[in-house]
């Protein structure tokens, strides 16, 4: 795409200056990125980045790009990699991959034997924190580790293919200046495939958006639904918060994680302290629709549906009656089909490829999930959530420190990350270090 066509694709986006129920930080396309000032802000406010990660991500280019971008953030207090790995050798390889960064990097082995033993011991206190394994469990552990010292914590996925210095800068700056009064920041973006430039984000575009519109027609403009609708990309997995908020959030353990966290934020924070920030064009791994409700985007949508409806119960005392299920099905299909037509127009004028038939099939598949999803919720209205860290520390004060110890790679010969020699020379700042490739991992991300 040449420069002219790129500007064309972005003009709508850059000229948007509308505000809504929550503060919106737009990208006006001016490129006003000041990394030197951002580094100074980081040094004055202990800030950690948390990246939940599977070992398979180390063989993909995205994580190498993230490492390269972050290697320029010398003021960062800590990078926490919440890693699911099969062996201590994998953990060692991950440590090698991130060696040479200008800040401490802690690779936390989320499913290591010591962590499992520690969390299993919590059953004696009546607490089930042993899983299920997944992003929610990794985020929960990573927050426990990161919140020991950091005042601000930002979370990014490990598969972002468009990661740039603007991502952490725009996500964290609203929280680094206390005068803004912001406690929580969530990303939004335009999901486009790097290869084909096709619209992505079907779960958000074709399920969550139409679902919230349909529910608002059934229940009216109740505050909780208006709140969810205020987010331009409610399923964004990139967000940041102040430590006091992070410590008080329960963490969902399924595909409802992002909506569930929004529900928790709604519970704890005034709307005036919530913001969303535009990260521009964004691409990461894509998930297939799936051939049945237990697969792919269909499984994700089913769990998101349950999370949205539980939020209505919790915050509004409202639930769908059996006789309202057909209404929801009809409304969702109508709104979903309207969205397909609208996205088709959007794609056509922006000269983006668009398969309307496949989009219609996705809406049909999502619609079939509504009835069993609502009925299942009536049978099991309470979902498993991991307790907040403030709740845990009220009954076992040393759990955070114990978790850090348990999550470290078991070895006596290699110093822990916080014992490594300082990266700063006595005479001044060290030159920017070059991250080293992870030799034990094949293929190596260069």
Predicted ranges, named:
Residues 75-87, 106-112:
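Short beta-strand/loop segment that forms part of the nucleotide-sugar
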Residues 2, 8-27, 102, 283-285, ...:
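Terminal low-complexity segments of carbohydrate-biosynthetic enzymes
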Residues 163-189, 193:
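Conserved donor-nucleotide/metal-binding helix-loop-beta segment in metal-dependent transferases, i.e.
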Residues 90-150:
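Active-site-proximal specificity loops/subdomain of glycosyltransferases
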Residues 8-71:
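N-proximal low-complexity "stem/linker" segments adjacent to membrane-targeting elements
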Residues 253, 263-282:
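Catalytic donor-sugar/metal-binding loop of nucleotide-sugar-dependent glycosyltransferases
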Residues 149-161:
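Short beta-strand-to-loop acidic/aromatic patch adjacent to the donor-nucleotide binding site
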Residues 195-205, 216-238:
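A recurrent flexible, glycine/aromatic-enriched loop bordering the glycosyltransferase active site
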